[in-house]
Amino acid sequence: VVLLWGSNARETHPIFFHHVLKGIRRGARLYAIDPRHTPTAAWAEGWLPLQVGTDIPLANGVAHVILRDGLENRAFIERATSGFAAYRDHILANYPLDRVARETGVPATTIEAMARDYARADRAMIAWTLGITEHHNAVDNVLSLINLALLTGHVGRWGSGLNPLRGQNNVQGGGDMGALPHKLVGFQDVEDPVARAKFEKLWGAPIPPKAGWHLTDMFRAMERGELTSLYVIGENPAQSEADGKHATHLLEHLEHLVVQDIFLTKTAELADVVLPATASFAEAEGTVTNSERRVQRVRRAVAPPPG
C-alpha cells in the first residue's frame, strides 16, 4: 500500500512513480490524498479529495479508524514509541469519523477503506511532497503522518516507511553536504564539539559553535533588527516567501543587500549590489543526489569565463 499525500508524483517525480506503477501492476494499492484529481490520482484505487488545509484532521481520522478497529501494532508501539496513551485518548476523543468527514469533505467510507488497507498491509509507505509542507503548519502536518507510521509499525523495515519526495533539484544533496544552518556534512551536528573539531582540521578554518538561522528565523531577526545585512545566492525570497509583501518590506530596510543570480529577480531589484552569476549548472563540477539517494556525478560542459 502506498499513500501519496499532497504529491502529484506522476508529473513531479516520474522515476519514483515508475516504480509505484510497477507495484500497482503486481497488486499494490495506491491512495492519492489531494484536493485535485491529478494524473497521479487517476492511477489510484482511492482518491481522497480533502479540503485545503485539513491534512491533520484527515490523518487523525485515519488514526481514529485504526484505533477504533484495533488495528494498531501493539508490539511495535510498546517497543519503539512513547506517549501512546495520551495520543490514543486525544484521537478517540477529538476526531470521530463523522466530524473528520464533515471537516475534510472526504467520505467516511473512503477514509475507513484507506485506514484499514494501510494498517493491514504487510508493507506500506507514506510519501509526501510540497502539498503538505508549504503550509504555516507544515511541521504538524508531517508529524501527523509520522504518527500513522508509528501507530502501525510501518517504519524501520524493508518495504515500509516514510518518504519525503524533495521539492527541488538536489535538495537532498545540499543537505547531505551540510548546506543547513545547524548541520555539517553528513548531517553531523554543528554544536557537537567532536564533529566540529574534525571538520575544522579538514577545512583549516574555525566553525561557529552555535547553529545558524533558518530562512524563517532570518526574517524574524530582520524584524528585531538583529540581521542588518544579507547575501542572497540563487534565491528569490521577495517572490517565494509566503507573505511576499512583508518579505519585500524587510528586504528593503536592510542596511546592505547583495544578490548573486543569473537573472535580475524581484529580490535583485531591491539589492544594493547585484553580482551577475554565470550559468553554474554548465560550468560546475559536483554531484546531484536524487530522491532515492542515488548520487550522480556532474561534469562541467564549459570552463567559466576568466575573472
Stretches with model-predicted labels:
Residues 1-170, 176-177, 189-307:
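Cofactor-pocket helix-loop regions in the catalytic cores of large enzyme subunits
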